[in-house]
Amino acid sequence: MTNHKLIEAVTKSQLRTDLPSFRPGDTLRVHVRIIEGTRERIQVFEGVVIKRRGGGVSETFTVRKISSGVGVERTFPLHTPKIEKIEVKRRGKVRRAKLYYLRSLRGKAARIQEIR
């Protein structure tokens, strides 16, 4: 087996298959496993996907939400075992792959149209 095929085989075995399909503009609920000392708990982070990047094992996505009037963005590796599950709450209709313009918008201007 050549090096390239070996890397490809190892990479393929690490990919998760239980994740839903989602795109930028969708509203997600990401259930993240957090370990604090000896305790382990699940934290839910709900917001709009503003970007996806990479491919294979190194693929990441960024979710943005407004918490107490402050914008919070969190980037997650897609295939990490720390993500318990991902729920798609709404499908958004956008015409961009990267929604960085949402950072400067507030209130109703930051709404994303829902796909029917």
From Swiss-Prot:
Keyword Ribonucleoprotein: yes
Any one annotated GO CC term: cytosolic large ribosomal subunit
InterPro entries: Ribosomal_bL19 (IPR001857), Ribosomal_bL19_CS (IPR018257), Ribosomal_bL19_sf (IPR038657), Translation_prot_SH3-like_sf (IPR008991)
SUPFAM superfamilies xrefs: Translation proteins SH3-like domain (SSF50104)
Any GO MF annotation of the entry: structural constituent of ribosome
Keywords: Ribonucleoprotein, Ribosomal protein
Keyword Ribonucleoprotein: yes
GO biological process: translation
Family: Belongs to the bacterial ribosomal protein bL19 family.
Function description: This protein is located at the 30S-50S ribosomal subunit interface and may play a role in the structure and function of the aminoacyl-tRNA binding site.
NCBIfam families: rplS_bact (TIGR01024)
Protein name (Swiss-Prot/TrEMBL): Large ribosomal subunit protein bL19
Species the sequence originates in: Staphylococcus aureus (strain NCTC 8325 / PS 47)
Taxonomic path: Bacteria, Bacillati, Bacillota, Bacilli, Bacillales
